[in-house]
């Protein structure tokens, strides 16, 4: 009935390592019904984001285990700060632009519009480099990288 009413249902669950598997894999608890009923299954994991010795946030990795709407087994990492900055809007966009051919990584620097700039400098002032037109191109790259067709 939820599908007919176009209402999404979000279910959270825990995962565990499969014992005795040849390749280490994660499995959801609660039986196999959820695996077959779900349209999308995303596994989340996190690691600490540090500034020196202080923990300032988390790096959250989302891996698509099953999806009827997008490509499976794709990873996306999101940075979440604990302070007022919250979710980092620009984290991971440098790598996405490199995959899509928007810019090149040459000897640890990104070549943008004929200039070579370090990633730290780009992330210090992201509004200067991630303009509206660049963000539209990155959106197109993300659509081809993560969705079907």
What do these predicted ranges mean?
Residues 1-100:
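Phosphate-binding/switch region of NTP-binding enzymes
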Residues 105-149:
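Terminal-proximal interaction/regulatory segments of ATP-powered molecular machines
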């Amino acid at each position: 009935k939820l599908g007919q009413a176009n209402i999404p249902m979000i279910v959270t669950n825990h995962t565990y390592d499969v014992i005795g598997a040849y390749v280490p894999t994660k499995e959801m608890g609660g039986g196999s019904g959820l695996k077959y009923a779900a349209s999308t299954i995303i596994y989340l994991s996190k690691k600490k984001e540090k500034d020196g010795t202080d923990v300032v946030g988390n790096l959250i990795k989302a891996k698509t285990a099953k999806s009827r709407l997008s490509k499976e087994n794709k990873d996306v990492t999101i940075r979440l700060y604990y302070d007022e900055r919250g979710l980092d809007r620009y984290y991971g966009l440098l790598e996405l632009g490199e995959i899509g051919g928007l810019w090149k990584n040459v000897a640890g620097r990104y070549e943008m519009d004929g200039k070579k700039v370090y990633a730290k400098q780009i992330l210090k002032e992201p509004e200067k480099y991630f303009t509206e037109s660049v963000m539209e191109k990155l959106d197109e790259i993300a659509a081809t990288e993560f969705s079907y067709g």
